[in-house]
């Protein structure tokens, strides 16, 4: 029995039996203060029946995608300007998520888990060539196609089979209190490519096999 006593929000990892691959991760977050309304006018619920890809371009500006508790398969999820993705506590979203090029003011948050939909490093028929990684912010090497002002907060990224979080032409972004746990080879934690600038990362934890 392992008992952990915590008197404030903390991220604690216990290394067991002197083995880097045997760890117990304890993520004790503060209480949520920014829980969105699941019944909001522009809220789209992702529930147990969700199994199709989601293209934010099919939804209006201001849409909130609300992932309810439970396990949900959404092979790929594309976010556009002024959209939000909320992953509730107890929710596991099996997906790959991208904020598209030229988009801005996007928020990804919640206390749930984003887990890689791909079960191998190779791409499968449920992804396309633009969803290479678990979470991608931006999608262009072109300086004129920058993704801006994206916030990623509080979520857990689990079991990526490729790079974990990739910034590809992203600027003025914030990553706060994000936890990444990976065991696959070459699951880089943060990758900064293209014209990526002014990225702030705070209070975050990485257990990956690179970077």
Regions found by a protein language model. Name each.
Residues 1-211:
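Extracellular/periplasmic carbohydrate-active domains that bind, remodel
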């Amino acid at each position: 029995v392992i008992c952990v006593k915590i008197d404030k929000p903390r991220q604690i990892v216990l290394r067991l039996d002197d083995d880097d691959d045997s760890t117990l991760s304890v993520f004790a977050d503060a209480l949520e203060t920014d829980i969105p309304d699941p019944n909001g006018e522009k809220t789209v619920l992702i529930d147990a029946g969700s199994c199709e890809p989601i293209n934010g371009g099919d939804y209006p500006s201001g849409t909130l995608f609300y992932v309810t508790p439970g396990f949900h398969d959404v092979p790929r999820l594309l976010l556009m300007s002024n959209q939000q993705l909320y992953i509730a506590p107890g929710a596991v979203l099996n997906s790959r998520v991208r904020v598209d090029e030229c988009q801005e003011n996007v928020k990804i948050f919640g206390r749930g888990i984003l887990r890689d939909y791909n079960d191998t490093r190779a791409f499968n028929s449920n992804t396309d060539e633009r969803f290479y990684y678990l979470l991608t912010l931006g999608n262009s090497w072109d300086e004129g196609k920058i993704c801006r002002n994206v916030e990623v907060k509080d979520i857990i990224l689990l079991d990526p089979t490729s790079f974990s979080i990739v910034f590809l032409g992203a600027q003025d972004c914030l990553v706060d209190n994000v936890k990444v746990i990976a065991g696959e080879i070459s699951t880089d934690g943060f990758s900064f490519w293209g014209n990526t600038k002014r990225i702030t990362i705070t209070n975050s934890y990485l257990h990956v096999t690179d970077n």
